Each structure stands twice: as structure tokens, then as C-alpha cells.
Amino acid sequence: MSDHFQLKSHFKPAGDQPTAIAQLCEGLEAGLAHQTLLGATGTGKTFTMANIINDLNRPTIIMAHNKTLAAQLYGEMKEFFPKNAVEYFVSYYDYYQPEAYVVSSDTFIEKDASINEHIEQMRLSATKALLERRDTIIVASVSAIYGLGDPKSYMKMMLLLKVGEKVDQRDMLRRLAEIQYTRNDVDFSRGTYRVRGEVVDIFPAESSTFAIRVEMFDDEIERLSIFDPLTGAIEKHIVRTTIYPKTHYVTPREKILGAIEKIQEELKDRRAQLLSANKLVEEQRVTQRTQYDIEMMRELGYCSGIENYSRYLSGRTPGDPPPTLLDYLPDDALMIIDESHVTVSQIGAMYKGDRSRKENLVEYGFRMPSAMDNRPLRFEEFEAISPQTIYVSATPGDFELDRCVGAIAEQVIRPTGLLDPLIEVRPVGDQVDDLLSEIYKSVEKGERVLVTTLTKRMSEDLTDYLSEHNVKVRYLHSDIDTVERVEIIRDLRAGVFDVLVGINLLREGLDMPEVALVAILDADKEGFLRSARSIIQTVGRAARHLEGRAILYGDRITKSMAKAMDETARRREIQHAYNIEHGIEPHSLAKKILDSMDVGEEAGPKDNLRLIRKESKKVLSAKEITVQIKQLDSKMHAYASDLEFEKAASVRDEIHELQQQLIN
């Protein structure tokens, strides 16, 4: 373990990178709160980020706008910093249905969730690293702005063990129960402990590879060891250790009792309000639900939906921001917001969506008004609590440009000498046939192709058409989960197929050096998917290939197209001049095809639709088919009740296939 970052790379900063690194580091040292790294696609923005982290030597959080990009960044940062703590913090839900009330049909939907235990372990590992180490990098999604347990309560509940310390074994086991560890002498797994005479084995909640053995003699800790929970082999003896709570939401007993008093006071006031408004059903509902929760908290220390009482458990006043991952960051931390033109707006949107759902729950007596404070941060709260920030994007948004006037580091030169892709405009009339001929040419040269369309229907039809013409093609759509999306991108790079079709899923941050051609169909249809920013991002997917080019199909050149083409031409001019001046011969980027998403593979959801589909393709017995049909039937109804009708229809088709197998 080191207090200093140790960057490992075969490359040195090149092109614009040294200038950008120096400018941003100087700005941070000078105390600038906001800076922007405007880096063209393929210029090595991630490597620049890694060098800034290494030179600055401060704990860092990198925020991405989705799990796919976060997984890619996590994999790259782990490569750059193998000896430091690189952690991953995203939502641990494989499936999440928040509680909601549909007024029109008088339907209450209970909270339902499937938690990915591997991701939960990585979240706990992330906060542990922040509390214990300076050399920590957290790669996070917008999950970082959602309520998390209060860090003060969390730290207060930690169990410290030292060799030679006097401790009663029963007291130690009681403390383990308080931090929600469960005793299991048979199945020793994460978040459990087992007792064998005077030996207590503890499997830390934040660990996947090691456990702690506490050996006692009478009432004294005689030895502490780290061992492999699978083989039982002792790895090393230690002098002290800290056992962290099993969940971030653990709360000391006295705080729970104090919170119960305040909850009862609020319940009394709320009942009076509802009765005075003659809302008898709502009054009965909120009384029954809240009193049940109070009894659970009093007896067990927690209840289902305890996060709805987080205002009282963390000692906040009404309207105060909830504690989040950002509260675990030290004061001198650094924040990097990747693909900021998307991530910033996403952070701002989280609060509004959450609030509208909660208002119904409160109004109709399913929750008390204090539940409104269990929420993500508002954007202004996020800004207030954020440390010094660097926004990273090839196309920064207006927000970043306004905040960073005079503090923008431009990175246009690629270390590989590659120029921005050539852009060509062709008519829409025969776009599909023209595209097919271009695909044939590219595939013959061993290149990959990305095609982006405007609608899901067109993507599906185009995929079918290309497939009928012997093109190895896949369609990337919104129903595909995070893990499978990464697999599809990896398969494209590996040459399992040659063409990937999508709508707006092919833009930010996807790193595919094998892609030489990007085709944008109906590029002259102005709108969000065909804005200048979107076109620049999409065209940028071909910027890592020597033969990189883009075809925009349109019967006219819109303002957005013109702006994107002008910016690309400007960059090409700068890049070409630099290459001539320094005698650089452009070459394609060679990058290993890594499985950066091993963060999600280990504990993928067993009921994942993708896995069920794979299973359904196998030859199954009649009994197995019947069991699968039952599983899929319940899943179909669940999707339908969540108004996810496309997924429900997809599951229905799977059921029909299985029923056909059963008949045959």
C-alpha cells in the first residue's frame, strides 16, 4: 500500500497531452474550481486524466454517465494504476422497481429489487478505500449523487480489533450483529461469520478474496490472520484490523431510538392533517405502515424501506441534502466528469424524476412527508459539495463552457498522428444500397463499420436487410443490459461480426480502434440525434483508424452538419500541420481487447433475460421447459406491470418458442 499514485504505462505523453496536463495541473494548484479538457476523440483523454491524477497525487472520483462507460474507464484505470486502489461505484441493482402509486388505476406498486452482490461488495470496497487510503481512484456513475449512509454513523459502527486487546467474545459477536453480519457456521460467505470454540472467522462485506480469523485465549485476542476463505490457507498474520459494516445504511442503536421519537412526532402531525382534510383512508394507511416500520426498527434495528426515514437517521433538518458518496471524499479530492456534455445534464435530471414519484406516495398516505428527503442531490447541491472539477469532453456543453471561460485545455493532436475522419455527404435516395456497397468494401479490408439510424424500426429493418445480404451484423438497442452491451462491443472488435447498427448508443466514450467507417443515415433530419454535437461524437468513433471516414446521408446540408464538418476540417488542418512539422507518420491505434467488464460478470443476475434466452436455445426436457415457462410467465407479467411492454413482448415470444418445443 502506498500514499502515492504509481502510473504504469509504456507510453509517454505526446502531441497535445503534455500541454493539456501542465495547464490543468497549474489550474488545480492555483485553486481553479472548474476547468475543461476539450479533447478530440482518440487524442488520449483517459491517459491525460491518468497523468493529472498521478502528478497531483490526490484522491479522485471519475464520474461517467452510464455503467458501460464506467466499466471501460475502470478497466483502463486499473491498467494504469495496478498498485493503487482503483474502485468501482455504480448502482448495485440488476433490477429495480421503486415503490409507486398509480392514481388513475388506484394501484400501489411495492418496491422490488434484485441486488448484484458483486457490485455491492465493490461499493463497500470503494468507501473503505476512501476512508483508509490517499491513493484512491473511484470510477462512479450518477449513482454517486443518490443517498448513502451517513459517513459519521458508518465510521462509528466500525469494529476495531487489535492483538492483545481484552474483549469478551459475546460482546464481539453482538457488535458483529449490530453491523448486520449474520452467523453461519455452514455457508461461510461475504457478510457472515462463524464460531469454532475460541476462533471466530469473519468474511468482510467489502471483500471477495480474503477473510479474517480472530483467535482468542480467554478474553484476549491472541492472533489475527488473513486467510483464503476457499482453501483456508493463512496468507499472513496482522496486528490490527477493521471490520466495516455490511451495509452503508447501518445506524447506531441510540440514533435509531432517537429517530423513532421524531418519526412518531411527525406521524402525529400527519394524521391530524389528513383527518382535518377528511382523508380517512390515507390516514389509516400512513398510520398502519409507519407503525409497522417503527416496530421493525425497534426490534431489529432496520426495516424494509428504512431509507425513507434517512432524514431522522442522519440527523438532518427538512430540505437538507442527503449524505452521498461525495461526503466520503476528503476536502482536497479531485473530481473528473467524463463525457460531461451528457453527464452534467443527467445529474441535473435525477432529482426531478424522483420527486414526482414521491409526491404521489406522500399525498395518498403511503409515505410521510419526510420521505421526500430520501432523494438524489439537486444540481445546485451537487455543485456546492463538489471538489475541484475537470470536465472532459470532445464536445463540451454550454454549462461547461460558461463555467470554464479561460480555463479550457484543448487536446486536438493524437499521439498516433491520426487525423479526424474525412466526412462525405451523399444523397438519401439510395442510402441503403450505397451503404451496403461501402460495407462490402470495408469488410474486404478487415475493417469494422458503425451505422446509426433515427428510429428503432429502421435499425431493425436495416439489420434484417444487411443480414439477408450475407453481412455479419448486430443491432445494439436499449433493451440490452450493461454486461451484454460490453460483450457486443468486444465481439465487434474481435471480428465476430463486422457491422454494428444502433440509434444513439454509438456515441460517447465507446473505444473501438477497429472501426474505419461510420455511416449516419438521414443526417439532414435536424434534432437531438442529429445535432452538431451528436454528429461530431458519432463521427469520432472512426477517429482511431488510419482509414477512418464518415458518410453522412442527406439531401441538404443542415446547420448542424455544416458546424460538425467545419469543426472537423479545422481539427484536420491543425493535426496535418503538426504531423508535417514533427515528421509524424500517422498509424492506427493498437489496443488490446480486454474484458473491462469483469466487474459485472462474476455475479450476473440469474434471472437475467439474456441468460434465460441462451438457456431456451438448448435442448431441454419437458420438465425443464415447463419450469422455464413458469419463470418467464412471471417475468412477463412483472415487465407489463412496470409498463415495460417491449420487454414483456420479447419474453412472450420466448414463451411461445418454448411452448412450441413442448408440443414437438
Swiss-Prot record:
Residues 26-414 form the Helicase ATP-binding domain. One of its GO terms (biological process) is SOS response. One of its GO terms (molecular function) is ATP binding. CDD domains: DEXHc_UvrB, SF2_C_UvrB. Keywords: ATP-binding, Cytoplasm, DNA damage, DNA excision, DNA repair, Excision nuclease, Nucleotide-binding, SOS response. Residues 431-597 form the Helicase C-terminal domain. Forms a heterotetramer with UvrA during the search for lesions. Interacts with UvrC in an incision complex. This is UvrABC system protein B. It comes from Pseudoalteromonas translucida (strain TAC 125).
